Amino acid sequence: MKVKYLEVDNDVNVFVVGDIHACYTLLKEKLKEVGFNYNRDLLIAVGDLVDRGKENEKCVGLLNEHWFTSIKGNHEDFCYKGMMDDHIKFYHRMPNNGGEWFYELPDDLMEAVGRRLNQLPIMLEVKYKGKKFGFVHADLPVQDWELAKEMFRSSQLIA
């Protein structure tokens, strides 16, 4: 799925977070500070859940939470593509990228995590309180949201 669509009830508080980079404990502390309600609220992550920090598997586990959704960032892409391309794997394992943890996983778990991260959408469109909000990890190739969605849906753009 390249584009994911969500409609969020008006009584839900929506929070958005950037690059978590495996800092699960810090994320949970910040959610507590802002009064995040796990039974009612929604947290949207704009990619880069993993790498660089120490709590990678916990951050991947966020994808199983009903209150959490994410799009794919370049670090999720590194995990998946690094399983098949030695050049990407080499780059991903460099200390500044922080991907070593991924290749230390047992093979079956590494494949499962890589596949799960690759399933994340590239674009997220949220309808909330009568408005439409669009999320991507980085930049779009065009400045028109609808055109960008169509390009991704029709596979004119590879991510």
Where are these regions (language model features)?
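Acidic, histidine-bearing metal-coordination/catalytic regions of metal-dependent phosphoesterases
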Residues: 1-14
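Short, flexible, glycine/charge-rich loop motifs used to bind or transfer phosphoryl groups or to couple energy/partner
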Residues: 4-6, 33-34, 124
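Short, flexible hinge/linker loops that cap or flank conserved catalytic cores
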Residues: 7-9, 37, 127
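Core catalytic region of metal-dependent phosphoesterases/phosphodiesterases
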Residues: 11-13, 17, 22-94
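Active-site neighborhood of divalent metal-dependent phosphoester bond hydrolases
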Residues: 56-126, 130-135, 141-142, 147-159
